[in-house]
Every structure is written in structure tokens, then in C-alpha cells.
């Protein structure tokens, strides 16, 4: 991958989720709705505030990911899933609002979103190619990101 990430277009984001008054929250409302990350990998450092990160497991259930001192959460992104023909799965995740009985809480996280070089070609790696040969067509990382941004903008 070295030649595909030596000019990466990554981003570091400081995420602040302010306290939400329970009376202003609709049933089932989330701080961040279910989504996957677009790039290759995401490294997340989260605080231990209630109402945190949840991931959807292979059992289709949502599982809380507790913050652990000194630990980072590593999420596989859509680009890496495409490079591996799904052998490594992109992580569907969301951020919950704390329950009303947990008191007032803000949430702070730091996320590093790693993306490949804008012109890197995302094409299924040979060892990951399925026996039936069916794979997504090659795409540049830049086009992949733009397609994902536009898809999100359209609400897809």
C-alpha cells in the first residue's frame, strides 16, 4: 500500500457532542446516525461519557464500545473493504444520546480518518479476489470519496 498512501488525504477531527435536554429529544434520536467511514481506517479516541459509540455486529445487534483508558478504537473503512473485496468489513456505527437518568453529559472524541492518495486506484488485491472473480470495478480513492460524499448528501 505504500505507493497508495504516501500523499494521503487524511483528516483529524475534534468531535464535540453537546449536552442534549431529554425533553428536546425524539424517541430513537441519535447524536450521530448509523454510518460507515469512507476511507481506509479510522482511529478514534473517545471519552467515557455515557451515550457513546455503538457498532453493529455480525449478529445485526448494536453493541456499546466502552472507552478504555489509553485505548483507541480502530474502524475499517469503505475503501479498505473494497480493496479486500469484503474480506475486511467496514464498520457500521453510530453515537447514542445518553439516557435521561444519566444526568447532563457532553461527549468529546478525536477521530483520525485515513484516506489513500487522491489518485490511488482502489482495485481488489490479488489474494482477496474471490473465486468467482466478481469484484467492484477499479476506482480512484478521490472518486470513491466524492461518490460517498454525494451519496450522504442525497441521504442514501
What are these regions (language model features)?
Residues 1-156:
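C-terminal flanking tails of non-heme Fe-dependent oxygenases
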Amino acid at each position: 500500500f505504500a505507493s497508495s498512501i504516501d500523499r494521503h488525504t487524511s483528516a483529524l477531527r475534534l468531535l464535540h457532542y453537546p449536552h442534549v435536554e431529554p425533553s428536546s429529544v425524539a424517541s430513537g434520536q441519535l447524536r450521530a446516525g448509523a454510518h460507515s467511514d469512507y476511507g481506509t481506517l479510522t482511529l478514534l479516541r473517545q471519552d467515557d461519557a455515557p451515550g457513546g459509540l455503538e457498532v453493529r455486529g455480525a449478529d445485526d445487534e448494536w453493541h456499546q464500545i466502552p472507552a478504555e483508558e489509553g485505548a483507541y478504537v480502530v474502524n475499517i473503512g469503505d475503501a479498505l473493504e473494497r480493496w479486500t473485496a469484503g474480506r475486511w468489513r467496514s464498520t457500521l456505527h453510530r453515537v447514542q444520546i445518553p439516557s435521561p437518568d444519566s444526568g447532563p453529559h457532553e461527549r468529546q472524541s478525536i477521530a483520525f480518518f485515513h484516506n489513500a492518495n487522491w489518485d490511488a486506484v482502489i482495485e481488489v488485491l490479488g489474494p482477496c479476489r474471490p473465486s468467482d472473480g466478481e469484484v467492484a470495478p477499479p476506482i480512484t480513492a478521490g472518486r470513491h470519496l466524492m461518490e460517498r460524499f454525494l451519496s450522504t448528501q442525497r441521504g442514501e
